Amino acid sequence: MSATTAATSANASEAPIVSLAHVTLAYGDVLALDGVSLDVRCGERLCVLGANGSGKSTLASVVCGLLAPDAGAVTLVGERVFANGAADFDAYRRARRKLGLVFQNPEDQIVTSMVEEDVAFGPENLGLPPERIEHLVRRELRRVAMERYAKADPARLSGGQRQRVTIAGALAMEPRVLVLDEPSSSLDVRGRRSVMRVVEKLRGVGCTVVHVTHFMDEALGADRVVVLDHGRVALAGTPQEVFSHAEEVRGLGLEEPFAGLLSARLRERGLDVAWTCDENALLSELARGTSGAAASPHAAAARTVGTVASPRRAAEATAAPRPAPAPMVRAEDVRFSYGRSRRRRRVPAAPQALDGVALDVPRGAHVALVGQTGSGKSTLLRLIAALDVPDQGRIEVDGISTADRRRRRRLHGRVGYVMQRPERQLFAETVAQDVAYGPTNLGLSPGEVEGRVRRALDLVGLTGKDDASPFQLSGGQQRLCALAGILAMGPGLLVLDEPTAGLDPQGRHNLRRILDGLNAAGTTLVEVTHAMEDAARADLVAVLDGGRVVLTGTPAEVFSAKNAERLHDMGLGIPRPLAFARALEDAGCARLGDPLTSEALADAIVREVGTKAGAPLGIASAADGRNE
């Protein structure tokens, strides 16, 4: 199906609820949308994919009536809002009452200091009766599992909790079309699941959903998928149709869904399976071919697949024992509450963010902190970076207590803090000036500052962008520019708060490559992440729950079968390859070990199938035309 046909198709007997025809929109000299034509049917769920800067958020703003294009025609919920180069403002006002939008960043949408008041803000502006508003607020807070926080201050909530409040506020206006601009980018596993359950429920009540996302698996439940590239529709169709163009999808800076990637890996290894992006279909096919397999001499090898997440750890595991160096970070019985004033007086209802945390971070290690939103991960990072000090207990970084005001100044150049969405800290006129700010404030000479700026920009792949405005870079490039400013200070410890959140797959891959290189060169990394696949790459994983560290160990230890129920109860998941392996085992397959990557899982499956006589699945020849 062609991109144009798929993007514009709608039932002939039914007028589309959203219609864009040859829409063009530019920001100055930058063309954000370039001749986009798109029809969305009533009750349809449409997913919009694309790399950072492809035009997704601009398209979302046009669909929800926030932006008028420069050219083309736009019809929203039956209102012709733009045609013949002019906007009809009365039509826009009528249409906006039936349109809802959830922004990418919840801070841009929250307007009050109490959760229930924020959810009520939209219905109040529609002039609804108070009793109706009260009903809507209760219903939508319950829908997003935030009813217990009705009286809370949104500023005191975690990022994921704030996002759920904005979704409730949009739904409280009962829109006919709801536009979601990456609503789950800052959520934990439980939060993402709850949001996607809400999205699925909307289908049953006839609400049309236009969903912008960087998570390929979220797109699998859509009726149609549209992929944008430089403001144009590059691919469109059902999820299976779009993702079957694997090479083209990768060329657009995206990635295949997990099932598509795994089935391709299996075909590359000669296993005769059909390519699919349907995880249940792949599971069923593999279960038929592997169930009841007897234990084989290869089983022991399979059990070790994926349990070592890095070559460095594998080398260290076989090296002779040696005395452990002093940890880069040591936290002892750390307690912290946001309810304390500067004079350290406790407010009676102060929430306890950290409650007796103990954690050692080995020098040169990569440590991942995981936990549901509100578990204390970001708070612990701030304390490690000496941005706050513990109420009780002690944190030492490189042997220096963060509570020692006189000595902790030495940490300013040694600890780099990469905040959530670090691009928000950009401020200078040029990229070079922004990156130079930190080393300049360390008192370095102009020549040394220039050298550090050049090396940092080379490291993050922004060579040649010295004189560009950081605000004209793509979202992914802005993230790298902010990281370069931190790296230019030469830190031995990087603490990163969800560094890949909001990045497209290519941006995530580039950032992971940079961080892996820094870690291999000796930089200690402490990273907060909601992606279990990212946590699986670390040397150590620490799980926080209720302000406490409740599990620590290697990824294989933390994600082991004995912890599965405990992790589930805490609202966490496990890496997708490991979850799929366990689902296969539940379906009757022999144990596949603990594969933490799709490559390790594919190896384990092929090994198992290859040792079972008479399996329905066969090993295809390398020349088999079905191999991709």
Describe each model-derived feature in a short phrase:
Residues 73-94, 394-410:
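ABC ATPase NBD Q-loop/coupling interface
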Residues 64, 385:
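Helix-to-loop junction immediately C-terminal to a conserved catalytic motif
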Residues 178-181, 494-497:
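Catalytic Walker B motif of ABC-type/P-loop ATPase nucleotide-binding domains
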Residues 153-157, 161, 469-473, 477:
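Conserved ABC ATPase signature
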